[in-house]
């Protein structure tokens, strides 16, 4: 999942993939941790809440012992061998019921990892394929897609800013929706600075039901104006290509 924004006291610098903010990196060695809870843990060992919480504390700081923040998140991702932007991290956040991108609370951590029977990095690595497989179920994917909207947008904003929306759409639909490249191009040149939840949910429905040639799109249907404009724009682009090809 795209990296979370730091809280107000943290610094933000550079640009992350898809044009989103990326915070300045902090050395992992500067993060106080407890002695590793991963020593001598075998995969066949039963789940231990105590061990799970000790693992959580490896990624927190004395200032915020009940919150795993961006620095801890990077270390956690490193330990389980995935990039923070990997979609499996979004699925994990969904399982935890996490409310803010880039952060896990102690309660969220315990809820999700108890359900997954994970109390160590080694056990989490084994669960990654299962978490990815959840995306193969259409209903589960829809739930995760809807969850991603509130999870990724700024909590004090009603809508998701367009940069975050494009990054999340790339993550969720980029590999599976044939028209995604054209839709991303449409957003680039459009007037839209944000996407509301109704638009967000309808983009998924559009990607699942409308054919590549747009022949089954009903302009009088109950689609958001944004998608009407996308269809009009794409048809114009295609007609221009056809005209250019025909005259050459």
Swiss-Prot record:
Give a Pfam family name. Cullin_binding
Q: Which UniProt keywords apply?
A: Nucleus, Ubl conjugation pathway
Task: Write down the InterPro entries for this protein, in alphabetical order.
Answer: DCN-prot, DCN1-like_PONY, PONY_dom
Domain called DCUN1: residue spans: 47-235
Report which residue ranges the record marks as coiled coil: none
Region of interest (Disordered), residue spans: 1-35
List the biased-composition ranges (Polar residues): 26-35
Q: GO CC annotations?
A: nucleus; ubiquitin ligase complex
A Gene Ontology biological process noted in the UniProt record is: protein neddylation
Q: Which PROSITE patterns match?
A: DCUN1
Where is this chain's protein located in or outside the cell? Nucleus
Instruction: List S-S links within the chain.
Output: none
Q: Which PANTHER family match?
A: DEFECTIVE IN CULLIN NEDDYLATION PROTEIN, RP42 RELATED
Q: What does this protein do?
A: Inhibits neddylation of cullin components of SCF-type E3 ubiquitin ligase complexes and thus regulates SCF-type complex activity. Essential for development. Function inhibits cell proliferation and cell growth.
The name this protein goes by in its record: DCN1-like protein 4
Q: Which organism does this sequence originate in?
A: Drosophila melanogaster (Fruit fly)
């Amino acid at each position: 999942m795209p990296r979370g924004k730091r809280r107000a006291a943290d610094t933000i610098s550079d640009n992350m993939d898809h044009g989103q903010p990326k915070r300045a990196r902090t050395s992992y060695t500067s993060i106080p941790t407890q002695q590793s809870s991963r020593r001598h843990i075998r995969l066949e060992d039963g789940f231990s809440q105590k061990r799970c919480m000790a693992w959580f504390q490896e990624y927190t700081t004395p200032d915020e012992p009940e919150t795993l923040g961006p620095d801890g998140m990077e270390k956690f991702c490193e330990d389980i061998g995935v990039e923070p932007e990997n979609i499996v991290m979004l699925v994990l956040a969904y399982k935890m019921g996490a409310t803010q991108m880039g952060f896990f609370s102690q309660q969220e951590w315990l809820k999700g990892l108890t359900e997954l029977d994970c109390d160590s990095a080694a056990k989490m690595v084994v669960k990654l394929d299962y978490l990815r497989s959840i995306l193969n179920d259409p209903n589960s994917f829809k739930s995760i897609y809807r969850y991603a909207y509130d999870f990724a947008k700024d909590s004090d904003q009603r809508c998701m800013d367009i940069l975050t929306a494009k990054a999340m759409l790339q993550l969720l639909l980029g590999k599976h929706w044939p028209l995604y490249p054209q839709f991303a191009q449409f957003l680039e040149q459009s007037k839209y600075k944000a996407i509301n939840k109704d638009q967000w949910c309808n983009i998924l429905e559009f990607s699942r039901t409308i054919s590549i040639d747009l022949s089954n799109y009903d302009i009088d249907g109950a689609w958001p104006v944004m998608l009407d404009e996308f269809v009009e724009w794409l048809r114009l682009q295609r007609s221009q290509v056809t005209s250019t090809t025909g005259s050459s």
